[in-house]
Regions:
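Short acidic (Asp/Glu) and glycine-rich catalytic loops that position anionic groups and cofactors
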Residues: 207-212, 258-264, 291-298
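Flexible, glycine/charged-enriched surface loops at secondary-structure junctions
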Residues: 104-108, 241-246, 293, 326-333
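Scaffold signal of the M16-like zinc-metallopeptidase fold and its non-catalytic homologs
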Residues: 61-66, 236-263
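A glycine-rich, hydrophobic/aromatic-adjacent loop/helix-cap motif
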Residues: 286-370
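Conserved short loop/turn motifs at secondary-structure junctions
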Residues: 109-117, 270-274, 298-305, 338-339
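N-terminal export/assembly segments and adjacent metallocofactor-ligating motifs
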Residues: 1-238, 275, 360-366
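Core structural elements
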Residues: 257, 279, 283-292
């Protein structure tokens, strides 16, 4: 290999799976990028997100990519910009932020972010040191709701830690892994072929993954919570729940039984447009499987819609009453990450400022109160 050519190991940045990749550079310029066969996670496979030509020409070396700060020249909306130095940009931004903080208090500034990769700790560190509690991102239409509702239900966030390869049944609820997460689909497909695992798909559309399912429920959009409650009702009504787990770990089961009874199969069928037979079949299939995983889904009721909160709670309850919490083949509750406090500087934000977070009183579970 030429002295000017080097191969570096990295992780693909385009989704949370972070597949291992090999990046080849020549004279400091990337000339090739491909999956790393030695990465135990993806074993050399990468999906269409990392199309080499699109990545290099459309992103890394795109001639329109900004490489230096631009400052607006003229009126807002005029489309005129002038290039300035990094020092000038930092100085002007800092001066403006300090002025806003002195005039209106640090909470006047709200920050936002994209999907988390590795840099979000810097984002929170900055906001905490600046003194503003008002920070957020796309998580409220992604899986932030799962992240706070599941701990409220059973003490941990586990729907992103499904045992895909150990489950006897995989339930993909509003999740098309063939199209959006091919690597995860590989594990599901392997499990189905090697262990005979079953697949249930809940999706309004006959998606790629729905076509592979043993049972597909073509749900009416926005009625996921009703379906989950209907399944809970069948499981309780037919005595299919895990008595040992419920007796040992669950509180309020009698109240749950009363609430679920308000959603008999016939009523749920009218709401969801799914036949009564399929609703019963899905409940029995999930409850009687030796193990079943129900990972979070973005296009079901999890991520958006007025019933998202109820859907997530109901799905969490489904996992619990069937004993699929923290067990092989179900959802696993992992210990929290141990980041040094200095990473986030949460302690730098006094309680007085935390109380000023927008929505603090209306949505305590999503604020510092929670």
């Amino acid at each position: 290999m030429s002295e000017n050519v080097e191969v570096l190991r990295a992780g693909c940045y385009f989704c949370h799976v972070r597949c291992g990749v090999l990046v080849t550079k020549k004279d400091g310029r990337i000339i090739d990028i491909k999956g790393d066969p030695d990465c135990p996670h993806n074993k050399g496979y990468v999906c269409q997100r990392l199309d080499k030509q699109r990545y290099l020409d459309g992103f890394v070396y795109n001639p329109n990519r900004l490489k230096r700060p631009l400052k607006r020249a003229g009126e807002r909306g005029g489309g005129k910009w002038e290039e300035i130095s990094w020092d000038q940009a930092f100085d002007e931004i800092a001066e403006r932020l300090i002025d806003l903080r002195e005039k209106y208090g640090p909470e006047t500034l709200a920050f936002t972010e994209g999907t988390a990769r590795t840099w979000t700790w810097l984002h929170y560190k900055f906001t905490n040191l600046f003194g503003s509690p008002n920070t957020g991102g796309n998580g409220t239409i992604c899986y932030s709701s799962d992240m706070w509702l599941e701990p409220c239900t059973y003490g941990g966030f586990c729907s992103d830690k499904s045992d895909w390869v150990g489950a006897d049944l995989v339930v993909l609820w509003g999740r098309n892994t063939i199209a959006s997460e091919p690597l995860l689909w590989h594990w599901v497909d392997t499990n189905m072929k090697e262990r005979g695992a079953k697949l249930m798909v809940i999706d309004p559309r006959c998606s790629e993954v729905a076509q592979k399912a043993d049972l597909w429920l073509q749900i009416r959009p926005g009625t996921d919570a009703a379906l989950a409650l209907g399944m809970i009702n069948v499981i309780i009504e037919e005595d299919l729940y895990d008595h040992e787990f419920v007796d040992e770990w669950c509180y309020g089961f009698d109240q749950l039984k009363e609430r679920a009874a308000e959603y008999p199969v016939e009523k749920v069928s009218e709401i969801t447009w799914i036949s009564s037979e399929k609703i019963r079949e899905s409940a029995r299939m999930y409850a009687t499987a030796p193990s079943a995983c129900l990972p979070w889904g973005q296009k079901g009721g999890d991520a958006s819609g007025i019933n998202a909160t109820s859907t997530i709670r109901a799905k969490a309850i489904l996992r619990a009453i069937t004993g699929n919490i923290d067990r092989k083949g179900g959802e696993l509750i992992a210990p929290p990450s141990r980041f040094p406090p200095s990473f986030y500087e949460h302690y730098a934000l006094p309680q007085e400022q935390r109380d000023k977070m927008i929505g603090n009183d209306r949505f305590p579970g999503l604020t510092y109160k929670g």
